[in-house]
From Swiss-Prot:
Tissue expression notes: Detected in muscle fibers of patients with mitochondrial diseases; not detected in normal muscle fibers.
Protein name (record): Golgi phosphoprotein 3
Something else known: Modulates sensitivity to rapamycin. Tumors expressing this protein are more sensitive to rapamycin in vivo.
Composition-biased stretches (Basic and acidic residues): 14-28
Effect noted on mutating W81A: Abolishes phosphoinositide binding and localization to the Golgi apparatus
Record PTM Phosphoserine, positions in chain: S35, S36
Outcome, altering R90A: Abolishes phosphoinositide binding and localization to the Golgi apparatus
Gene Ontology biological process terms in this record: asymmetric Golgi ribbon formation; cell adhesion molecule production; cell migration; cellular response to rapamycin; gene expression; glycoprotein biosynthetic process; Golgi organization; Golgi ribbon formation
Phylogenetic placement of the source organism: Eukaryota, Metazoa, Chordata, Craniata, Vertebrata
InterPro entries for the chain: GPP34-like, GPP34-like_sf
Molecular function (Gene Ontology), one example: phosphatidylinositol-4-phosphate binding
Subunit annotation: Homodimer. Interacts with the coatomer complex. Interacts with MYO18A; the interaction is direct and may link Golgi membranes to the actin cytoskeleton. Interacts with GCNT1; may control its retention in the Golgi. Interacts with VPS35.
Biased composition (Polar residues): 1-11
């Protein structure tokens, strides 16, 4: 392991520990006995992440996983025809922040407002250690009145006609995520000439990590299919939904045999046909996750 890798690993570890300590202090200040089920679940999710065998360099965020599925291995860029991945990555950010206990939806109220009309509010402003996530979290925290999930996906993507809200756009997201993957040893950086201009590309350098990611997605809808989204790992469930919304899920299924492919797509369709409004009412669900799903499937 190089000294650079060691330094980056230590930095990530220190950031993660600092974030967890800050979040724990804030929860303690709010009253330990009154902590919600979501708080407990978010702590379990973070602990599960820490317990996984992968090194810090190869533990990927939802955004990085979706981008990795969309990148061409040798060329090092996403398809020029993919106009879905931009909004999909913003949806990943909202879910990632929710899974880390930073965001939640406002209470549904007596009249039970729908997922798409409920506002996103900041639950904790403790740093995540990820620059993009912290940037998005800062926007959510400082915005009054709050916005809905659908609005945040559009605002963070820059898809607004209101010039006063253009500052919400997160710029160069794909390039910044690719650089994160370069630092984690998954991609490398090259310059390619495209007739009239040069373009920075990020070809795959660690195929094992991508193959593990593809295998994880395939197994979720084949060998390890449980036919119940609430028994699936939340992060994996979100990955399947967001990979589909970003139009990159097909890349994970491309190597499958015809029968496996048909079964996998059938089961993904089962997930897409679920009603997020119904699913979010079940026990131990993450409402932001289902609100993002609703934004992309309604």
């Amino acid at each position: 392991m190089t000294s650079l890798t060691q330094r980056s690993s230590g930095l990530v570890q220190r950031r993660t520990e600092a974030s967890r300590n800050a979040a724990d202090k804030e929860r303690a200040a709010g009253g330990g006995a009154g902590s919600s089920e979501d708080d407990a679940q978010s702590r379990r999710d973070e602990q599960d992440d820490d317990d996984k065998g992968d090194s810090k360099e190869t533990r990927l965020t939802l955004m990085e996983e979706v981008l990795l599925l969309g990148l061409k291995d040798r060329e090092g860029y996403t398809s020029f025809w993919n106009d879905c991945i931009s909004s999909g990555l913003r949806g990943c950010m909202l879910i990632e922040l929710a899974l880390r206990g930073r965001l939640q939806l406002e209470a549904c109220g007596m009249r039970r407002k729908s997922l798409l009309t409920r506002k996103v509010i900041c639950k904790s402003d403790a740093p995540t250690g990820d620059v993009l996530l912290d940037e998005a979290l800062k926007h959510v925290k400082e915005t009054q009145p709050p916005e809905t999930v659908q609005n945040w996906i559009e605002l963070l993507s820059g898809e607004t006609w209101n010039p006063l809200k253009l500052h919400y756009q997160l710029r160069n997201v794909r390039e910044r995520l690719a650089k994160n993957l370069v630092e984690k040893g998954v991609l490398t950086t090259e310059k390619q000439n495209f007739l009239l201009f040069d373009m920075t590309t990020h070809p795959l350098t660690n195929n094992n990590i991508k193959q593990r990611l593809i295998k994880k997605v395939q197994e979720a809808v084949l060998d390890k299919w449980v036919n119940d989204p609430h028994r699936m790992d939340r992060r994996l469930l979100a990955l399947i939904y967001l990979a589909h919304a970003s139009d990159v899920l097909e890349n994970a299924f491309a190597p499958l045999l015809d029968e496996q492919y048909d079964l996998a797509t059938k089961r993904v369709r089962q997930l897409l046909d679920l009603d997020p409004e119904v699913e979010c009412l079940k026990a131990n669900t993450n409402e932001v996750l289902w609100a993002v799903v609703a934004a992309f499937t309604k």
